[in-house]
A protein has these predicted regions:
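Active-site C-terminal subdomain of aminotransferase-like
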Residues: 149, 154, 166-289, 293-298, ...
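Conserved beta-loop-alpha segment that forms the PLP phosphate-binding cup at the N-terminus of a helix
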Residues: 20, 24, 40-71, 85-89
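Pyridoxal 5′-phosphate
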Residues: 57, 103-105, 118, 124-125, ...
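PLP-dependent aminotransferase-like
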Residues: 65-122
Length: 388
């Protein structure tokens, strides 16, 4: 029904523009827009995904801080656990990245962030949760720091935006993470993850319109007429906007509470199950539905190869070498099978250490040990360049 529509032309496709406004408003309401501390001006747009939302938040923060402080050599501070989309944004927008090691709990090190702040700092990033380990950074402390120094704070809720608000309602001990926290200036939240909307739907939100206006590109001297675009894309698929709206309206509060309850419960069971497997340990104290684990007894990447042969697709992590599972509704009926296969895989590696034929363990292991990261980067580029 909406496949022919284009939100770029709001005057033509008014119904799609209204749907986008409602998706943004509903998402903002989940993330503190109704709280007095938010300031009551939360605004935003839909994007094609978490990476675009992050790119826009970084670009907007850069331009906003340039207008406020005249910063021309911008820097941003991120934890080493922050998503790689921030590195992409830094490359796109000529921003220096100051990457801070995580603390012993694998969280953003607030003291380390503070040491990196200088006259060129435009923003800091906190994750809720971070993609690698499923841990929520200390957003309140980062907010205090951002307020103290007058810089932007972006909270990456791409993964947690449609889980944490409902987990909190269900009684889980979720630390503050949204616009109710003083100092938070922008938030990215994917609707196409736990919001269960079609792929290609995310949102980027701002504390007020003064900040958000720096996201837009307005052109007045084009012979084609006056032009303004809110996001990275010009034309956008209205069908995805409608799909996101339909998903949110169909599920509603009760639907999201039900799905969140199921995946949170299974996530805790998986966490305990991994802890009970000899030779494995869970990294940190997962706040949500991502459970990362490593091993001091076996090569965890060899375990991953065997799990892959059994049909499980886990993410391989580094520093430390580890794996993670991102629990979804599909896992709720088969988590016991997952834990059994994982224990069997660990025992297989214990009994027969060494890479399996065709496995990726040697590649992951070698890449992690190579001191020349430039060479590793070149290998990644060559791999991507060969794809098409």
């Amino acid at each position: 029904m909406f496949s022919h529509t284009n939100p770029l032309h709001q005057d033509v496709f008014k119904s799609v523009a209204q749907l986008e406004a409602e998706v943004v408003a509903m998402t903002a309401a989940l993330l503190g827009s109704k709280e007095k501390a938010s300031g009551g001006q939360i605004c935003g747009n839909m994007t094609s995904g978490g990476t675009e939302s992050i790119l826009l938040a970084v670009k907007t923060s850069r331009d906003y801080m340039q207008s406020k402080k005249g910063i021309t050599k911008p820097e941003m501070i991120i934890a080493e656990s922050a998503h790689s989309a921030y590195d992409k944004a830094a490359q796109y927008f000529n921003i220096k990245v100051r990457r801070v090691p995580v603390n012993k709990e694998f969280l953003a090190d607030v003291k380390g962030f503070k040491r990196c702040i200088n006259g060129n700092t435009i923003m800091m990033v906190g994750s809720a949760p971070g993609f690698p380990h499923g841990l929520i950074d200390p957003i309140e402390e980062l907010g205090e720091l951002a307020s103290q120094y007058g810089i932007c704070l972006h909270v990456d809720l791409c993964l947690g935006g449609f889980v944490l608000p409902f987990a909190r309602k269900l009684g889980y001990p979720i630390p503050p993470f949204d616009f109710s926290v003083k100092g938070v200036t922008s938030i990215s939240t994917d609707v196409h993850k736990y919001g269960l909307a079609p792929k290609g739907t995310s949102t980027v939100l701002y504390r007020n319109h003064e900040i958000r206006k720096h996201q837009f590109v307005a052109v007045t001297e084009w012979t084609g007429g006056l032009y303004i675009s809110p996001t990275m894309a010009g034309s956008r698929p209205g069908g995805l906007v409608a799909g996101a709206w339909a998903a949110m309206m169909s599920l509603g509060l009760n639907g999201y509470l039900e799905s969140t309850g199921k995946i949170m419960e299974v996530s805790k069971k998986i966490q305990k199950g991994i802890d009970d497997i000899s030779g494995l340990f869970v990294i940190g104290k997962p706040d949500m539905t991502v459970v990362a684990f490593g091993s001091d007894a076996v090569d965890i990447f060899e375990v991953n190869d065997i799990m892959s042969s059994k049909g499980w697709h886990l993410n391989a992590l580094q520093r430390p070498n580890s794996l993670h599972i991102c629990v979804t509704l599909q896992h709720t009926a088969i988590y016991e099978e997952f834990l059994k296969d994982l224990e069997d895989s660990v025992n297989t590696v214990k009994a027969n250490p060494g890479p399996i034929s065709g496995g990726m363990a040697p590649i992951y292991g070698a890449a992690g040990k190579m001191p020349d990261r430039g060479t590793v980067k070149e290998l990644l580029v060559e791999f991507m360049d060969s794809s098409c």
